[in-house]
From Swiss-Prot:
It is found in: Nucleus, Nucleolus. It is an enzyme of class 3 (hydrolase). It comes from Candida glabrata (strain ATCC 2001 / BCRC 20586 / JCM 3761 / NBRC 0622 / NRRL Y-65 / CBS 138). Its main location: nucleus. The gene is DBP3. One of its GO terms (molecular function) is RNA binding. Residues 159-332 form the Helicase ATP-binding domain. GO terms for cellular component: nucleolus; preribosome, large subunit precursor. The Q motif is unique to and characteristic of the DEAD box family of RNA helicases and controls ATP binding and hydrolysis. InterPro entries: DEAD/DEAH_box_helicase_dom, Helicase_ATP-bd, Helicase_C-like, P-loop_NTPase, RNA-helicase_DEAD-box_CS. This is ATP-dependent RNA helicase DBP3. Coiled coil: none annotated.
Length: 540
């Protein structure tokens, strides 16, 4: 073998060795990688197994805990639903033994069925009265309330707190029995007092003359047989007789304006008042009575005063007013008062019509709602303003209808007479503007007709609330025109909320809500920015 061949062979061997080493190195790398992967897979598998075992163990433990907790809850529920509560005594209020024996399940069902919520800062958790025999009252008061089948929800829940001396806020629809809710504890307190009452002990503030008169009529049912004097004072009538009445009365119902007049002239002393009621508080604020209310409250002694506030809605303004003069009030709400909602016992019918055909349509509706077996049914018709009401009144009289009317063009005496005629059945038609939209308790109104839609959807809800009161059913028939289309969205929401049909013609106007403005009468004053100062114009 030559030297050259030897060198060539050696070179070939070196290349082969290097290639072999490279292959061994590569194989080792692959093997290491595989081993590493296998090791990782083994570790992952082990961790997964451990995790699964741990999860199964935890699930088993959770299942056992849930089972134990459920068993504990069942035991507790059994105790609360089957065991009577301990008898409660707070101040002058002693819970009736029969009420104490009621299973908690019965109480819970009452709250659920009547959509009752109670916010009680003192955590007294007083049980509602399910029957009149579950409360101990003066005999005459007991006899008067026994004429009714059972307490209304607002009465059932508020009476125990009021008889315990607590301040109470009642948020409930009109027609829910609010007058007796505050009236019964007030009169009972006077009758069971250790000393004979002197001066004004009970003061009820009301936004309108009509509502004040109505409250007075209800309270007289409680006071007339027990020797307690009660009077009502409001504007529009001479003061002389009111001065004489108020001087000898222990219970006074008043509108803010007339009461302030009597206070300022020295005819009224409110220092003895120890039970004060603001009825329709939200409406009083709407009417601009806030400062008047504060001045009246300032005439009483806050230390000894028990204060009540009843309201159909719970806006910010009412909350702020309550916080300024009430002491840890118990808030009782009946129904869903956070949202604007209509009484579900009312059948709502909305017709979209041409504005020019409304009064002709009204005559057709009266034939429908006051014929045959419905001949003597009470019908309440709402106009928007007194000018419209006067025109419609003349038209109805011309067409042979006997109609009673209450609106701003009439004197107080004429309005009172009209209400009495409607209540007594002498007239089965009442024509009203929104002065009567809230608070008036006119029994057995079967139908409300909205001839012209009100300025706000809130007013619509209050208007139709004149029917379907005290557990009864009713009908509200509304004539809606293109002039009110900006209110269509809010009306649709109310109809949907009460599970009432929504006409296609109404939906065509759109379902979004706009600012409060009436097409025929202009902007609703609350939506106009009154804070803007006039712009000064200068000429060079």
């Amino acid at each position: 073998m030559t030297v050259e061949e030897s060198k060539k062979r050696k070179l070939t061997d070196d290349v082969a060795i290097k290639q072999n080493e490279k292959k061994i190195k590569k194989d080792k790398k692959v093997k290491d990688k595989k081993d590493k992967k296998d090791k990782k897979d083994k570790k992952d598998k082990k961790e997964k197994k451990e995790k699964k075992e741990k999860k199964e163990k935890n699930d088993k433990k959770d299942k056992k805990d849930k089972k134990d907790k459920k068993a504990e809850q069942v035991d507790k529920l059994s105790e609360t639903t089957e065991q009577p509560s301990k008898q409660v005594k707070i101040g002058a209020y002693v819970e009736n033994e029969e009420l104490s024996k009621q299973p908690q399940s019965v109480i819970d069902e009452f709250f659920k069925e009547n959509e009752v919520s109670v916010e009680d800062p003192s955590k007294l958790n007083l049980r509602p009265l399910l029957a009149f025999n579950q409360i101990s009252l003066d005999k005459e008061v007991q006899n008067e309330i026994a004429k009714f089948p059972k307490p209304t929800p607002i009465q059932a829940v508020s009476w125990p707190y009021l008889l315990s001396g607590k301040d109470v806020i009642g948020v409930a629809e009109t027609g829910s029995g609010k007058t007796f809710a505050f009236g019964v504890p007030a009169i009972n307190n006077l009758l069971t007092s250790s000393s004979k009452p002197k001066g004004i002990k009970v003061l009820v503030i009301s936004p309108t003359r009509e509502l004040a008169s109505q409250i007075y009529d209800n309270l007289v049912l409680l006071t007339q047989k027990v020797g307690i004097d009660c009077c009502v004072v409001y504007g529009g009538v001479p003061k002389d007789d009111q001065r004489r009445q108020i001087a000898k009365s222990n219970v006074v119902v008043a509108t803010p304006g007339r009461l302030l007049d009597l206070i300022e002239e020295g005819s009224v002393d409110l220092s003895p008042v120890d039970y004060m009621v603001l009825d329709e508080a939200d409406r009083m604020l709407e009417k601009g009575f806030e400062e008047d209310i504060k001045r009246i409250i300032g005439q009483t002694k806050s230390k000894d005063r028990q204060t009540l506030m009843f309201t159909a809605t719970w806006p910010k303004e009412v909350r702020e007013l309550a916080s300024t003069f009430m002491k840890e009030p118990v808030k009782v709400s009946i129904g869903n008062r956070d949202e604007l909602s209509a009484n579900k016992r009312i059948t709502q019918i909305v017709e979209v019509v041409d504005p020019r055909s409304k009064e002709r349509k009204l005559l057709d509706l009266l034939k429908k709602y006051q014929s045959g077996p419905k001949k003597n049914d009470k019908v309440l018709i709402f106009a928007l303003y007194k000018k419209e009401a006067s025109r419609v009144e003349r038209n109805l009289n011309y067409n042979g209808y006997k109609v009673a009317a209450i609106h701003g063009d009439l004197s107080q005496q004429q309005r009172t007479q009209a209400l009495n005629e409607f209540k007594s059945g002498k007239s089965n038609l009442l024509l009203a503007t929104d002065v009567a939209a809230r608070g008036l308790d006119i029994p057995n109104v079967k139908t409300v007709i909205n001839l012209t839609f009100p300025l706000t959807v809130e007013d619509y809800v209050h208007r139709i609330g004149r029917t379907g009161r005290a557990g009864q059913t009713g009908t509200a028939h509304t004539l809606f025109t293109e002039q009110e289309k900006h209110l269509a969205g809010g009306l649709v929401n109310v109809l949907n909320g009460a599970n009432q049909p929504v006409p296609e013609d109404l939906i065509k106007f759109g379902t979004h809500t706009k600012r409060k403005e009436h097409g025929a009468y202009g902007a609703f004053f609350k939506d106009i920015d009154m804070s803007k100062k006039p712009k000064k114009i200068t000429f060079d």
